[in-house]
């Protein structure tokens, strides 16, 4: 992309973003950028942002790689512990890099019941709190009297 036909104002960008359109904008220092992160999902949720969708795809691939090495292992507590430990390490690495604010992997007798063990199924639940991106910045400037103390 070498240019944009219409230079968008801040208000233009905000108007487009309010109706779920990520505007393409030109900034002197940054160049041409997609200025937004919304998806076309109509229902408000964490998945209506591109960064969360991409994170979820990445997490599913990573945990699936861990799961694939667990296939055909004994469906016992030691295997569960190994899977959970490896998933915790993977998710912890993502958290350290600010992709997640928190997570929990549940893999125990509440998720993998004796009935599931008898059917050769290991069942884990991965709860995640994705990090959210800043979309708007609000800054207040407050003018105070000359004698005012900022400690009060």
Task: Give, region by region, the residue ranges found by the protein language model.
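Structured, hydrophobic secondary-structure cores that serve as assembly/anchoring elements
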Residues: 1-152
């Amino acid at each position: 992309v070498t240019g944009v036909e219409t230079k968008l104002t801040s208000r233009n960008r905000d108007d487009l973003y309010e109706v779920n359109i990520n505007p393409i904008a030109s900034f002197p220092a940054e160049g041409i950028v997609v200025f937004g992160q919304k998806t076309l999902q109509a229902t408000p949720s964490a998945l209506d942002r591109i960064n969360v969708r991409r994170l979820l795809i990445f997490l599913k691939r990573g945990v699936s790689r861990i799961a694939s090495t667990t296939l055909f292992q004994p469906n016992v507590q030691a295997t569960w512990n190994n899977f959970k430990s490896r998933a915790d390490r993977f998710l912890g690495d993502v958290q350290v890099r600010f992709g997640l604010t928190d997570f929990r992997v549940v893999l125990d007798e509440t998720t993998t019941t004796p009935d599931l063990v008898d059917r050769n199924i290991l069942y884990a639940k991965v709860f995640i709190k994705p990090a959210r991106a800043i979309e708007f910045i609000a800054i207040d400037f407050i003018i105070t009297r000359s004698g005012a103390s900022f400690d009060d």
